Amino acid sequence: MARATSANKRNAYRGKRTAAAAKSRPSAKPYTKEQLKPHKKHRFLGFLACVFALLTLFATAARALPADLQELPYVPILISATPWFMLLGLIALLLAIVSRKILAALIAIAAVALNGYWQYPFFYSTTPLPQAAHNAVAYNEANTSDAFARVMTFNVYKGQADAQSIVETVRDQRVEVLALQETTDGFVKKLKDAGIERYLPYSNISSSDGVYGNGLWSATPLAQPVDDEVNSSASFMPAGTVDMGGNSIRFVSVHTTAPVPGYWRQWKRSLDELGLMQSHTDNRYIFMGDFNATYDHAPFREFLGTRFYDAARISGHGFTFSWPTNRPGLPMFAGIDHVVVDQGMTAGQCKVVKIAGSDHAALLVTVDVMQS
């Protein structure tokens, strides 16, 4: 009984002491509205997240437009940078997470996922180039008797590109067929003086305006040469047939209209004219040149249809950005130069090479024309 009383006294004392301590402590003040507001830094990051997410969404929507709507002013230019908007979307997602902008994060996730779906085939080859093709183009000199060839396309920018560098690239890369765009008479003479005919003695050059032209150079004869295979409203697109290990392959040097103010509709028209080549089943084609369009442009994909294939995409090489090369501080961001192969062909060993004097880079590809 005495023990119980003592314990009760101790508990009562502790209770009084706890109550006294509680009274002596200052009561917690509620947060003010200012304290509940996000930090200025977070607000700025949230603003950037929203802006970047909306830009990515806008660019993604433009890429999804049908071909007829992609000829609207400035839409082709926006679409040419589509892969870069995927990167912008990832930045938007990171900023949205940091600033807790849920809607911006969801928009960024959707846009990045869709862009990733569009772009991943560039990094995965379903039809890899056979080892025999790799071996064939590895010799010191080009072997023109097999079904494999190293080909090259390059826009020489109004004939201003360095002719000597072109010849050296042809030599070093063992190029068998070369397509050039925007040539001039003076440039062609410089090319000859630099020794192009030592490696590619056969050529077919044509011009629709008498000033700038397009051309083909080959290590073997160009059979059935024509000035304009496509009947294009943009420029003459010369062609010639090359024998590759018993396979007759028709090469075309392509240059479509650039998507610039005043020429939006003409840009699409020049690509539509190329699309008519799908019905020319009497030849097997390889188109090389400046298409002024990336794979993200619907008119370019319509030209490919179910018959033709972009070499960079089927090779799994990744992006082949080739323009512009003459803007200080600005990287090449658009893959508008292409090698397009016919069904049954495979391609690989894609390479982009900068050559002085042009606003484009050269694109080199190894092709295997054996029917697969």
Give the residues covered by each predicted segment:
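N-terminal targeting leaders characterized by basic, low-complexity, disordered sequences
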Residues: M1-K40, F44-F47, V51
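Membrane-embedded alpha-helical segments of integral membrane proteins
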Residues: L48-A96
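Alpha-helical transmembrane segments
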Residues: K41-F52, L78-A81, L103-A110
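Membrane-helix interface segments
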Residues: E71, K101-A104
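Internal catalytic or translocation cores that form aromatic/hydrophobic pockets or channels
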Residues: V175
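N-terminal signal-anchor transmembrane helix
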Residues: V98, L106-D172, K189
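Soluble catalytic domains of enzymes that build or remodel membrane lipids, polysaccharides, and related
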Residues: V151, Y157-R171, L180-S372
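Structural signal for the C-terminal ends of transmembrane alpha-helices
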Residues: L94-I102, Q371
